Amino acid sequence: MTLKGNGAPEGISYGRGSSMTQTRLRFYIGELDWQGQPVPAICFDEVERYLGTHYPGFTLYHTEGFWQGSRESSRVYEVLTLGGPDPAIVSEYFAQVCGQRAGLVTIETVEVITCTT
């Protein structure tokens, strides 16, 4: 990402009277596939590479939850966007990379932040 003199990424203006919107998204990706088998680590490596390429950075953490009556571990990727690709593309990419081994992907918009100068 290239920053201009005012600290704004290229293509984004922070001039007087302008506004910028950031969205905090969470991608919950199940660690088990549809048959209850562990999703191969290479699938997560590819998703992390994709996120690192298309978003400014991400936070990764793990969570345990219940889905349809059974306990399931998920990897949670949280990103703060300044645009970037449509979030649904991440789940499409995950399904493309992992095929039938892909786990459930849930996308949640956590927060929308608008700054006006």
Residue ranges and their predicted role:
Residues 3, 7-117:
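Positively charged, small/polar-rich N-terminal and surface patches that mediate targeting and assembly
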